[in-house]
């Protein structure tokens, strides 16, 4: 009984995590319709500028130890996959000041963004949660939990997409 309850909970969490998808737009466009994203200089980010490349959007928080743990491997993966057209975007729903202070204190050279809506309102219920979008803006992979982004297995998977 306990096992069934856990499986049902997991199933509903996965369904919830993909709830931002709208069949009329690409998954990436649908995500942007649900929320607006700004960079640390408070410029709006238009996801259409990534139409010809692959995008990894990772949802995280400054208080999330597993999120912080995977950031160095995200940076290494970004460098390894430079010739494969990948852009890595790290999205938080915290304040610009909090994200900027975190970036400066941790000295992470990554693309940090702020979502203007709470994660729950766009269907993200666990952190870190990462979505990989192909060149057409379609979700091709979803990861919930810590990923060793620079592992041979993940790098090969991303190269093959």
Residue spans for each PLM region:
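Positively charged n-region of N-terminal signal peptides that target proteins for export
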Residues: 1-4
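Bacterial N-terminal signal peptides
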Residues: 7-15
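N-proximal helix/coil linker or "cap" segments that precede and/or mark the start of modular domains
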Residues: 14-34
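A short beta-strand-turn-helix
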Residues: 34-55
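Short pre-active-site segment immediately N-terminal to redox-active cysteine/selenocysteine motifs
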Residues: 53-55, 59-63, 95, 126
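Conserved redox-active cysteine motifs that mediate thiol-disulfide chemistry
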Residues: 59-76
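Short, internal strand/loop/helix patches
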Residues: 89, 100-135, 144
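Thiol-/selenol-based redox modules, centered on thioredoxin-like
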Residues: 132-161
